[in-house]
């Protein structure tokens, strides 16, 4: 049950007041000031989101009660930690990111379980497994610049995060900071499962994530996400193709990159180098003819049968002209129930 004081503050925070009342709100404990925030604490009557300042829309500027509590803990704002806990924030989340003994004691006095070892990893995995917008945002806020991560097995954590998402988070495990890895992890999970509120939140709070959004869309073979991302990201078509070729059966991403002007012969060789043979045959369908180089590469990989097949002069190409603005609907329609033409050609050749 809320205390009388917390109830009174809840009523005040749920209403709108003129700037003349701001000094009273500061005295009343409904003001939040730090490096990025400076304004009255308000609560949306419709979605229970916390808003700080004079913003009319909680979708762009609001935060859940748990996220507000987590940020208050990181700010060492004792009065707001107590208030948000009374209003329904989960103090256990606050305890997981308390970075001083005094703040840890405060969280425990408010009912938090003392965090221990595996609890941090269990929470991280749980919040990403629920596939819920708010849980991904909670996870990001808890572990963003969390000192406890200085004491975890870094390589083990990187491997776990990489295995949990279908999208490559980095080029090499040892060439990315943990903070950036976690940011990419939360973002990749949001894009992978189309959690739009989480994507919107991360776009507003994590700098320079638009190029990674495009990488995710290419890897996930989603022409509509690719099309949207290309409106704000200027990436070289050959770089896009390189990403598309890393996952087999990524025909829509390959076709989109090809239509933008990516080199289809390079794509054929990249696909073979990654061992993604369906992609390689699709590139041949689109007009790739680097058969000599591909045959040599197949020989180096000890794929003798493939090397022999690539030496046959039987392949046909379906040339699709490049265009500046590919249509994702057209791409999806072209590839609906698509069968690899030149794989069928090979079967016909050997079954004569």
Swiss-Prot record:
The entry's keywords: Early protein
Induction note: Expressed in the early phase of the viral replicative cycle.
GO biological process: taxis
Superkingdom classification of source: Viruses
Pfam families the record matches: ASFV_360
InterPro entries from the UniProt entry: ASFV_MGF360
Keyword Nuclease: no
Protein purpose: Plays a role in virus cell tropism, and may be required for efficient virus replication in macrophages.
Family: Belongs to the asfivirus MGF 360 family.
Name the UniProt record assigns to this protein: Protein MGF 360-16R
């Amino acid at each position: 049950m809320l205390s009388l004081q917390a109830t009174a503050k809840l009523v005040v925070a749920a209403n709108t007041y003129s700037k003349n009342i701001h000094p009273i709100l500061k005295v009343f404990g409904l003001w939040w000031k730090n490096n990025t925030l400076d304004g009255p604490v308000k609560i949306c009557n419709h979605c229970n989101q916390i808003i700080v300042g004079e913003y009319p829309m909680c979708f762009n500027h609001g935060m859940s009660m748990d996220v507000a509590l987590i940020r208050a803990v990181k700010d060492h704002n004792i009065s707001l930690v107590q208030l948000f806990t009374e209003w329904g924030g989960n103090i256990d989340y606050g305890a997981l990111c308390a970075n001083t003994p005094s703040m840890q004691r405060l969280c425990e006095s408010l009912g938090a379980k003392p965090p221990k070892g595996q609890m941090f990893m269990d929470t991280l995995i749980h919040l990403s497994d629920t596939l819920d917008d708010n849980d991904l945002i909670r996870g990001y806020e808890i572990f963003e610049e969390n000192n406890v991560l200085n004491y975890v097995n870094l390589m083990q954590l990187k491997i776990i995060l990489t295995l949990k998402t279908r999208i490559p988070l980095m080029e090499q495990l040892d060439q990315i900071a943990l903070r950036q890895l976690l940011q990419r992890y939360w973002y990749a999970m949001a894009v992978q499962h189309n959690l739009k509120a989480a994507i919107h939140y991360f776009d507003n709070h994590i700098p320079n994530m638009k190029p990674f959004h495009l990488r995710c869309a290419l890897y996930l073979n989603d022409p509509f996400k690719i099309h949207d991302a290309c409106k704000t990201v200027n990436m070289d078509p050959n770089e896009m193709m390189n990403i598309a070729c890393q996952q087999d059966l990524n025909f829509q991403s390959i076709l989109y990159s090809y239509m933008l002007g990516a080199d289809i012969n390079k794509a054929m060789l990249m696909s073979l180098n990654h061992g993604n043979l369906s992609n390689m045959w699709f590139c041949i369908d689109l007009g790739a003819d680097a058969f000599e180089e591909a045959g040599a590469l197949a020989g180096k990989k000890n794929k003798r049968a493939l090397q022999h097949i690539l030496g046959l002069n039987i392949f046909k190409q379906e040339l699709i002209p490049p265009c500046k603005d590919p249509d994702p609907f057209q791409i999806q329609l072209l590839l609906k129930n698509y069968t690899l033409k030149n794989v069928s050609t090979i079967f016909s050749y050997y079954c004569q």
